[in-house]
Amino acid sequence: VMVFQPLPEGAHRAVLPGYNYPYHEAIDFYHHYKEDIALFAEMGFKVFRMSIAWTRIYPNGVEETPNQAGLDFYRNVFLELKKYGIEPLVTIQHYDVPLYLEETFGGWKNRRLIELFDRYTETLSGIQGPGEILADLQ
């Protein structure tokens, strides 16, 4: 099933001033995760459900090497959670297949995605070289 639906040719997504929520960066967890996690701990959270974006690790899904900045970000989030005794509950694919894979291969309809997804998960689990962001946080 293709979750991403491209717009018809010539159409543009509209962000109407004053109509949509005015702050388009949402909670900006990427820049505020340390403060957010400290607040979670203050509220007594023991588990934090989060997703890892495939595109933050392999932006197009077909790169030869993972994006080190993405790996570092998640490693830092996990270490911050560990510091406060909060266990991460991680989703590794949440309807966010890289757009390039949707456009080039048709998404999950193409078996090539199994190989690419396998490489992505190996990177996350530390099996594939420098991407060991989950393995050493036990």
Feature map (PLM): residue ranges:
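Substrate-binding cleft and catalytic face of glycoside hydrolase catalytic domains
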Residues: 37-138
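Aromatic- and Gly/Pro-rich amphipathic surface segment
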Residues: 2-38, 43
